[in-house]
């Protein structure tokens, strides 16, 4: 046996430290490095906590709570019911409130990119005459800063949301809760991508004065649009509905058009809106975010549950919220997004991971559904095989599949749903997120897209926090 082993080429599988496989590669030995980490990433306090949860007398209650959370996600039926200005509909919004993406953060601790979006919003609202005055106002303490997620909202990239901005209004028909998000400015040099010059302000003014009222009045005629059904259709047409929205945008504007042409606006204004929608496939991106938010909020606040209901980033920290731990954020450092850069930019130009758009992955689409959108690898990098494998791998850290939203390429498997902090902690597999990359400095905009994962520290804190809360 030993003679046979050494008389043929070796094909080695290495588990653990990569230095061993690296050394074999230098010797021209075929080697496969197994992507594996120990439970709790080797932190014995986390390993003990995971064991305590698994062996807890509360095990039956945990299982029942998690089943309820999964069912609430699956049974949620979000529909678009309207558009209106944030001051009219968003809980807690005031003329001097600025909502932002991610977990809570103060002006002093915000990254430069988010500060740029905030100052742009203050100029747009007429609270400052220019960016310098806006910076002084933001630092004065007169402005209230708060996470979108704590106001039933989500916000793409910087997520900056102010009183005059028009919002999607999405109702969960099953459970009655409502979620909001602002409208797409389309792509590249825009406020959510932390650009803030006069062209950005002019576009926001037009959205407030023309597009917003037109879509508001159109929805009064239409009544409601079934977003869960539309999402399922978009995934079957090649979108993953986070960074690829070709089909979703077509379906959404198709549904809105009858209301638009009956709403009494001039042909010229209608033309402007249709041209704006046609300028970028991202028009439906925020719509899916609000849809996912409506579903995930329905699963939040279930005692004993270990299901993740929020993943969000503010450019400094990545934050999680867990169903059974309402009112708490578990944070770790925001990561650098890895992926192709636009011409003229390099990785060191990029800001850290930012935005509430990871609510899509929390629900089970976006990075979790990349097998529906193999063409997305041209934007975010990687291979088609890797995109497909992401969808398979995410099933290992979730409690089930959503039969309402399926992946044709994987035998119409439902998208992986209900991320479980204990499964992440035990397996070492982190949720995959595909996302845009904003420049680290204000005023530039989007410079690429790629793949990112939460820091394990978020899950570590959540696991330990759960044990502390429930005395395990």
Label each residue range with its predicted role:
Residues 2-472:
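Anaerobic metallocofactor- and corrinoid-dependent redox/one-carbon enzyme cores
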């Amino acid at each position: 046996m030993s003679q046979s082993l050494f008389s043929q080429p070796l094909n080695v599988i290495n588990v653990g430290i990569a230095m061993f496989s690296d050394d074999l590669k230098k010797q021209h030995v075929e080697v496969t490095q197994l992507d594996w980490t120990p439970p709790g990433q080797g932190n014995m306090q986390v390993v003990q906590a995971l064991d305590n949860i698994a062996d807890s007398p509360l095990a039956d209650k945990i299982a029942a709570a998690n089943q309820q959370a999964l069912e609430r996600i699956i049974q949620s039926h979000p529909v678009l019911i309207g558009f209106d200005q944030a001051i009219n509909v968003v809980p807690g919004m005031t003329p001097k409130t600025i909502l932002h993406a991610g977990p809570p953060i103060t002006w002093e601790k915000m990254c430069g990119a988010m500060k740029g979006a905030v100052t742009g919003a203050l100029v747009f609202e007429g609270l400052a005459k220019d960016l310098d005055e806006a910076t002084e106002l933001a630092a004065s303490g007169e402005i209230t800063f708060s996470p979108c997620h704590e106001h039933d909202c989500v916000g793409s990239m910087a997520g900056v949301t102010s009183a005059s901005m028009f919002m999607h209004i999405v109702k969960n028909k099953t459970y009655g809760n409502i979620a909001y998000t602002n409208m797409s400015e389309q792509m590249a040099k825009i406020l959510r991508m932390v650009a803030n010059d006069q062209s950005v302000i002019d576009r926001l003014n037009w959205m407030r004065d023309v597009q917003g009222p037109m879509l508001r009045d159109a929805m009064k005629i239409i009544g409601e649009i079934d977003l869960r059904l539309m999402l399922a259709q978009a995934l079957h047409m090649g979108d993953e509905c986070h960074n690829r929205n070709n089909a979703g945008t077509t379906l959404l504007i198709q549904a809105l058009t009858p209301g638009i042409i009956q709403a009494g606006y001039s042909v010229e204004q209608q033309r402007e809106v249709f041209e704006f929608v046609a300028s970028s496939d991202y028009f439906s991106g925020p719509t899916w975010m609000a849809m996912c938010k409506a579903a995930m909020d329905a699963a939040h606040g279930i005692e004993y549950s270990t299901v993740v209901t929020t993943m969000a980033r503010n450019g400094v920290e990545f934050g999680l919220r867990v169903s059974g731990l309402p009112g708490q954020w578990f944070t770790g450092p925001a990561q650098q997004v890895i992926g192709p850069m636009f011409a003229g930019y390099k990785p060191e130009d990029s800001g850290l991971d930012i935005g509430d758009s990871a609510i899509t992955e929390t629900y089970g689409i976006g990075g979790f559904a990349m097998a529906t959108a193999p063409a997305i690898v041209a934007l975010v990098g990687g291979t088609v095989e890797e995109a497909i494998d992401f969808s398979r791998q995410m099933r290992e850290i979730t409690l089930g599949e959503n039969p309402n939203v399926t992946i044709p390429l994987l035998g119409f498997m439902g998208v992986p749903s209900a991320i479980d902090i204990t499964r992440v902690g035990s397996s070492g597999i982190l949720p995959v997120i595909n996302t845009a990359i904003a420049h680290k400095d204000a005023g530039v905009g989007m410079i690429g897209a790629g793949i990112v994962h939460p820091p394990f520290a978020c899950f570590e804190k959540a696991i330990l926090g759960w044990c502390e809360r429930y005395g395990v």
